[in-house]
């Protein structure tokens, strides 16, 4: 019994709203099998499928899926089944799935099959559970049988990046793997030994030791540390800066005589009334 897909809240993305951009060279070309009238059009659809699913890095002759191409040319399968076959191929498994963690595999696959990035980490976790319980093939089937895929591409359209703005196209982003694969290669090179047992097997420099420690471990360790301010260092730094500063003497002697105020006779009102002293 497979685990149902966990719920997640979609985030704001360009593809979720209608756009009113003027078409330009960045506007995606829609490849539709129903519009193909000759073999050249079918070749263009096949090429677009390879470019979208395998990305630019894996479009080589040895990675072609001749059986799927033949079925599509003879209309034995539709475009959605052709895309499904590319996702389940050994090329996609060995060159994409096996080189990435489940979280990154989810993000890459969503970009190539649904034309958008993952909404958030909750979606990555939800789909990674599907990968863990149903495998890569079950994950591919779940995406291509989803309502989102059917509403945007149906059975006849090659998936494309929906409403790309400013960023590079998904199929041109390098590399296809990240530090996760490099860390695995390091562990394989150690042959199952721990870092400390490998250290005693020969003379290592500090650079060798730094390369043996995974970068993601250092990043995680840095997040755990509580940021603290070194007040002692701050006080010492400020003290060293101001101890040699000479404050200029801005005082000056008063040379102008002090102004004295003397009383002045003033004609006050009602001075004409007898008996009132108004002066």
UniProtKB/Swiss-Prot annotation:
Localization, UniProt: Cellular thylakoid membrane
Topology of the protein relative to the lipid bilayer: Peripheral membrane protein
Pfam families in UniProt: PBS_linker_poly
GO BP: any one term: photosynthesis
Extent of the signal sequence: none
UniProt record similarity statement: Belongs to the phycobilisome linker protein family.
The name this protein goes by in its record: Phycobilisome rod-core linker polypeptide CpcG1
Native source organism of the sequence: Nostoc sp. (strain PCC 7120 / SAG 25.82 / UTEX 2576)
Lineage: Bacteria, Bacillati, Cyanobacteriota, Cyanophyceae, Nostocales
Gene: cpcG1
